[in-house]
Amino acid sequence: MSEENIVYLVPPGSIRCCITGKLRKDTPEENVRQRWARSLVEEYGFPRSDIMLEVPIRMGIAKKRADIVVFNPGAKHVQEEALIILETKRDDVKASDKTNGEDQLKSYMAASSSCKYGLWVGQERFAFERSQDGKIESVSDIPRAGEDRPRRPERTDLKVAHDLTAIFRRCHNYIHGNGGLQKAEAFHEMLKLIFCKVYDEEEGGSDELNFAIGPKEQRSESGKRRLLEERIQPLFTKVRKRYPYIFKDDEHIELEPSVLAYIVSEMQFISLVDTDTDVKGAAYEELVGQNLRGDRGEYFTPRNVCDMTVRIIQSMFEEAELTDLCS
């Protein structure tokens, strides 16, 4: 039997590591770590051979373990060759957490002389860069494979999203936590930006994207304000005119420039247009279900129930297309 025809079974309570292929315990933390390990390979372009999980980090006489480390190309998997360090936490862990927050990542970066970038992921996502004088500063993202610095994406850089649900969740959490808005209001602002993102992908005539922000812009207040006033607000004006039955004539983006900059940096490298419809549907259902329907006792039918029903019906009838969601 060829290797291509072998199906590896994963026992309950386990998850297969996308880097090593070995089984690991299925926990909320491990799920986040595996999502980001996969993202490093499929979206950022790093080879699996340069990535390692649970890497020992020596800090004085103590030793800690970094969740994920990307090493210099082809280098040994040792602390002295660390290029990027990632700390991946459960979706409910805040960056301000004293034990597992962003300070933990910064301490690992400070202890690793060759580490240039870091990424902390939990309830939100934050990237950091070590400057020439050794200071660790905020940056929009970590660089892609083969690049020295993060940059503003172009149209050809857009990739399909494999875990859109987590991206939407972090964005909504950030708007709700930092924008001074209630959950329903935060959802509506998120909806505006999703429409802006799709419109920019579909209607942009050049390789330049409006729904994008560069590292220098994100570091300055004037850059963030320029993003809002010169790119996103005009983009939303076009969206509003195209969808007058969704958005009112006097609506505009209500977010502060700093909050908007975070959302754009989270979504700018993904293609909502090219992402699989089921992935988009699952992400949207969770976003809507958490914010608009539960208080009225209304919920989306679970997707596994939908899939099961469709398969049962398909085995009974020969029609090419059927839907079980007519309520």
Residues covered by each model-derived region:
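Long recognition/docking surfaces used for binding and targeting
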Residues: 195-292
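Active-site metal-binding core of divalent-cation-utilizing nuclease and nuclease-like domains
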Residues: 22-24, 48-80
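Nucleic-acid nuclease catalytic cores
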Residues: 93-138
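Conserved catalytic cores of phosphodiester-cleaving nucleases, focusing on short active-site segments
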Residues: 36, 66-72, 80-92, 108
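Conserved S-adenosyl-L-methionine
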Residues: 301-327
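Domain-level recognition of nuclease-like catalytic cores that cleave nucleotide substrates
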Residues: 2-9, 120-159
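Charged, often low-complexity linker/regulatory segments
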Residues: 1-43, 153-174
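Structural motif
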Residues: 27-30, 176-191, 254-255, 273-278
